[in-house]
Amino acid sequence: MDAIILCAGKGERLRPLTENRPKPMIPIAGKPILQHIIEKVEDLVDNIYLIVKYKKEKIVDYFKNHPKIKFLEQGEIDGTGQAVLTAKDYVDDEFLVINGDIIFEDDLEEFLKYKYAVAVKEVKNPENFGVVVLDDENNIIELQEKPENPKSNLINAGIYKFDKKIFELIEKTKISERGERELTDAIKHLIKEEKVKGIKLNGYWNDVGRPWDILEANKYLLDKINTDIKGKIEENVVIKGEVIIEEGAIVKANSVIEGPAIIKKGAVVGPLAYIRPYTVLMENTFVGNSSEVKASIIMKNTKIPHLSYVGDSIIGENCNFGCNTITANLRFDDKPVKVNIKSKRVESVRKLGVIMGDNVKTGIQVSFMPGVKVGSNCWIGASCLIDRDIESNTFVYKRDELIFRKLK
């Protein structure tokens, strides 16, 4: 038994976070999405084939020493069907296929009982997904792609069990106008010829497609951690709840950490810093004097040195915040924060701060309005109020007129 994990997509709805990394490499609860998936499947299979393309070197470099993992590069044709077809000459007769951008709780042993199976999940908004219709024996009888009037509340959850017949059906599938070959089109042919079991997922499941999905999945996974403190803790530090502090991390004097939270190797907190629940500080980050971070993911090598507030935000790698940088995360009317996703204004959640790419620098007293996205490699000058998205490689600054008058 082998597994194929689909990791080739660009993750455009998650930009700017995916400008410098593939979506499966976005860290949630201290490790990439892809690592969470691999940990669910690695004991069940002999080989794990990662189908890579976009920013493939990030995936290869991170997982190159895993004994079961092999890398296959998807060709010019895009789409999930083409991604699966990439492994045609490598996998065993039976194999699992898993989307590389989902966080899920259920174990996968149930899938091994069937020749063909698709994971399904009951949701409140099936019209936003691919809908699955089952018969009385839980066999799939119909697939609908984002229908206006869904026939079911069950959706395709992105986990499959196939044999090599699926390759034959994928090859018969027409390439779409977008130049893609889709796996679901092949499954529509499969259900006409074979019984395909719909396996209902009962536990947590998250299709990580939007920035707030990352923060939601982060909360779910952090709720499962247990305290493990190996780093250096200075005097008068207060630690509450479940907190992981890795070896090589330092929490300086008079800081407060409220779990669940993870502080990775090389991170420095304090003195007098406040880390609130559902925060992850990745490797070599710095949250300094009188800075507060709440329910946020701070990626590697980012510095928030002093008198700053970051809430409900995702901050990329190698960012540096000037003194008194503030992220707002709540509207006055308490309605969901609106975010631009692929040129559309979308309602997110009640609290959402800033979504920031890599290598961003802010001057002193910079403020961000809720839901703002900042692209990679930006500079933001002192005293700016950022109330709209900033494209990558942009320098934003303001000019206030200074008036000089002679005193008598």
Curated annotation (Swiss-Prot):
Keyword Nucleotidyltransferase in annotation: yes
The EC number(s) this enzyme carries: 2.7.7.23, 2.3.1.157
pH dependence: Optimum pH is 7.5.
UniProt-annotated stretches for the region Linker: 203-222
Temperature dependence, free-text field: Optimum temperature is 50-60 degrees Celsius. Activity is 22% lower at 60 degrees Celsius and 60% lower at 100 degrees. Thermostable.
Catalysed reactions listed for this entry: N-acetyl-alpha-D-glucosamine 1-phosphate + UTP + H(+) = UDP-N-acetyl-alpha-D-glucosamine + diphosphate; alpha-D-glucosamine 1-phosphate + acetyl-CoA = N-acetyl-alpha-D-glucosamine 1-phosphate + CoA + H(+)
Enzyme category, top tier: transferase
Region spans: N-acetyltransferase: 223-408
Record-listed N-acetyl-alpha-D-glucosamine 1-phosphate binding positions: 80, 130, 142, 156
Molecular function terms, GO-annotated: glucosamine-1-phosphate N-acetyltransferase activity; UDP-N-acetylglucosamine diphosphorylase activity
Protein residues bound to acetyl-CoA: 382, 399
GO biological process entries: UDP-N-acetylglucosamine biosynthetic process
InterPro entries in the record: Bifunctiontional_GlmU_arc-type (IPR023915), GlmU-like (IPR050065), NTP_transferase_dom (IPR005835), Nucleotide-diphossugar_trans (IPR029044), Trimer_LpxA-like_sf (IPR011004)
List of catalytic residues: 306 (proton acceptor)
SUPFAM superfamilies: Nucleotide-diphospho-sugar transferases (SSF53448), Trimeric LpxA-like enzymes (SSF51161)
Binding positions for UTP per the UniProt entry: 6-9, 74, 79
Family: In the N-terminal section; belongs to the N-acetylglucosamine-1-phosphate uridyltransferase family.
Stated name of the protein: Bifunctional protein GlmU
Species of provenance: Methanocaldococcus jannaschii (strain ATCC 43067 / DSM 2661 / JAL-1 / JCM 10045 / NBRC 100440) (Methanococcus jannaschii)
Source lineage: Archaea, Methanobacteriati, Methanobacteriota, Methanomada group, Methanococci
